[in-house]
Amino acid sequence: MKRSLTALTVTAVVAAAALTLTGCSGSTPTEDAAGATAGTDPVALTMWGTYGNGGNTAQTDVLNDTLIPSFEASHPGITVEYVDIPYDSLKQKLTTGAAAGELPDLARVDIGWVPQFASLGVLASLDETMDDFTTLADATYPGSLATNAWDGHYYGLPLDTNTRVLVTSQAALDAAGMSASPATFDELETMAANLEGTGIALFADSGLQGWNVLPWIWSGGGEITDEGLTTSSGYLDSAASVAAVQMLVDLYQADAIPNLITGNSGATSTSDGLPSTQYATILDGPWMRDIWTGQYPDFTPIYAPVPAGDGGSVSVVGGEDIVIPASSSNQDAAAEFVRFTQSDEFQLAMAQVGQMPVVESAGSAAAQADPFYEPFATQLATAKPRLAIPQSSEVDTILSTELTPAFDGSTTVQVALTRAAEQIDALLASS
């Protein structure tokens, strides 16, 4: 599967240019990289990323002022220039750069992009080029690692991660007569019954894409495909998957879930509805702490695992991966920086500015240093990735398009998931 960019067929280059903006321990140096550290062959690496997205300078400051200087000090002869690019522009820049043969040595990319670029031969397969890849990979959260897999190889390593957990408030728990967050599907339904007549909706979410519905399907014991990513039929439309989605549909039709989930842009957002106690629960991530601290300083959210069904408590993985373009002429030096990103030094420094570690031991250490991260680190132990295929954004469209009529009552959940599975089968076949 590994190909250099110069070996790409004309078709693949055209396909790369056609990609759209779809798509959220240190180690012993290699012999070649060690030569660079000795100063015999200076190497200047360039890395593209989005650490400054939204005007956030805290992460770029740590990277440029602390981490890169530390790496350069321990690797004489290798320098790293980080180029910050707006998130909305990075994928297009990578796409046009691939077509023109003008890519950096390293890139921090959204987890959903790795299969797309790997399928076009744009990325180096790290499991083939890094002798210690297995050791590094085994130290990360399995769900985060899986986002780098494509066609039997791994084209990156996790860089930072996140997941969604259940968030509620003491006011909502009091209104429902509960002493703790609902830990199971049954307790969630009990909470819904207890909230009847209070004017508080049980749960809210902003869509029906994979990010939204997969935690419920997985926790209910369902799957979206088989393990080998060859078929969706029989999995997405299984009895377990149907039952999990049916629970949401029943709650929606009982007015326990507002129509924000089916696309009503005029509905109160989850970030406003939870602190104002319009909504009793939502699923959300660690980034909400800073948002609520600024907008609702008196609000104290309560974080807990996704309610468990027959499949346990399972959420969805988000985050970014680090990749090496196959066109880079500095593969060994770039691999040295990839190794550095997996170290406790890098992971814990970034944790202090809001990036959740991908290395399990660093995740535990970050949770001990800041208990806020504990529920997210716990959830990541079982969290799963969305489908790691080039057409992942199309899967989201299929789910949303087919599930909306089921929520509105114009079709059944079984029919909706069967239709979705058939369309995903076609995507898997074309992959």
Go through the PLM ranges and name each one.
Residues 3-10, 17, 21-115, 308-310, ...:
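Conserved N-terminal structural module of periplasmic/extracytoplasmic solute-binding proteins
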Residues 72, 215, 246-330:
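Extracytoplasmic/periplasmic substrate-binding proteins
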Residues 104-105, 134-171, 201-202, 312-314, ...:
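A structural signal for short loop-to-beta-strand junctions that line the ligand-binding cleft
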Residues 111-163, 216, 298, 302, ...:
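Hinge/lid segment of periplasmic solute-binding proteins
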Residues 127-140, 202-203, 222-243, 294-296, ...:
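Short, solvent-exposed loop/beta-turn-alpha elements that line the ligand-binding surface or hinge
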Residues 143, 301, 351-398:
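Long, aromatic- and glycine/proline-rich binding clefts that accommodate carbohydrate-like moieties
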Residues 174-175, 381-431:
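Conserved C-terminal helix/tail region of periplasmic/extracytoplasmic solute-binding proteins
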Residues 192-194, 231-261:
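Glycine-centered hinge/linker elements that transmit conformational signals in sensory
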